[in-house]
């Protein structure tokens, strides 16, 4: 796995921890998310999907390139 793919997966893990922290904080206070928190959480989940998609594509491209090199 390339360094770029590793960085993307690390970034995704960091965003997930932030999102989880937001949910955990609201749960600890026995309340729903505020409108601002809800917007932040929605942005984080969108970022999670985008980062994961980018990482998956990068990894697939690396595997394709590796297979092409091996077939030569």
Describe each PLM feature range.
Residues 1-72:
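Intrinsically disordered, low-complexity terminal tails
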């Amino acid at each position: 796995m390339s360094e770029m793919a590793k960085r993307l997966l690390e970034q995704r893990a960091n965003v997930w921890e932030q999102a989880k922290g937001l949910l955990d904080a609201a749960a600890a206070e026995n309340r729903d998310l505020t409108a601002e928190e809800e917007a932040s959480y929605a942005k984080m989940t969108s970022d999670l999907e985008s980062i994961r998609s980018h990482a998956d594509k990068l990894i697939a491209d690396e595997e394709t390139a590796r297979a092409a090199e091996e077939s030569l």
